[in-house]
């Protein structure tokens, strides 16, 4: 399979950064150099804390009273882990935004529903969004991320100027960011009350 890893790194980073009005403090889990490279495109980010995938729940607990604007979770290891979501949410400010890897809403429906329900029990806005993972047998393979937000909406509150005028994107732009949240009617109906717009 031809890898398009840079697309996931851009979509999991720039969607939440450009949803939040003033993201200054960011926490990443399993993002490493991929996410840091994307965050380096923004001069206004003042602090980035990286946690490893293994032991992330304990790592969150050990951060103390810090507050973050954006959380980027590059793994889906914790997407259906209530303790993880609770500890992560404690570290976000009242308008915090989370982007996290999740199950595919077409091919892993039961898992995706459980993940969305869990996040939706904590956040008023919970929406899956698509990105292209790679090319396999000349077919484009799509996967999903989730944006969970306490206040900002990813399509209504997107900072268009920041999304389109920041240098260095290979894939991401405001049109892609908005279109990534589009879902077919039959999927929207199946996830009615679970996807929280």
Where are the predicted features?
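A short glycine-rich, Lys/Arg-flanked "PGG" loop and its adjoining helix->strand segment in the class I
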Residues: 81-96, 120
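SAM/dcSAM-binding transferase cores
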Residues: 138-197
């Amino acid at each position: 399979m031809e890898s398009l890893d840079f697309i996931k790194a851009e979509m999991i980073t720039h969607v939440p950064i450009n949803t939040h009005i003033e993201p200054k403090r960011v926490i990443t889990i399993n993002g490493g150099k991929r996410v840091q490279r994307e965050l380096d495109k923004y001069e206004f980010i003042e602090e980035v804390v990286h946690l490893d995938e293994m032991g992330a729940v304990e790592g969150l607990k050990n951060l103390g009273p810090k507050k973050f604007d954006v959380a980027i979770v590059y793994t889906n290891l914790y997407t259906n882990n209530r303790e993880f979501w609770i500890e992560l949410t404690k570290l976000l400010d009242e308008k915090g935004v989370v982007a996290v890897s999740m199950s595919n809403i077409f091919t892993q429906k039961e898992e995706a529903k459980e993940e969305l329900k869990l996040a939706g029990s904590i956040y008023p806005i919970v929406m899956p969004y698509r990105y292209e993972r790679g090319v396999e047998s000349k077919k484009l393979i799509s996967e999903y991320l989730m944006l969970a937000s306490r206040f900002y909406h990813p399509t209504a509150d997107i900072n268009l100027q920041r999304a389109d005028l920041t240098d260095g994107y290979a894939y991401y732009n405001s049109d892609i960011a908005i279109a990534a949240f589009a879902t077919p009617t039959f999927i929207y109906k199946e996830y009615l009350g679970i996807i929280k717009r």
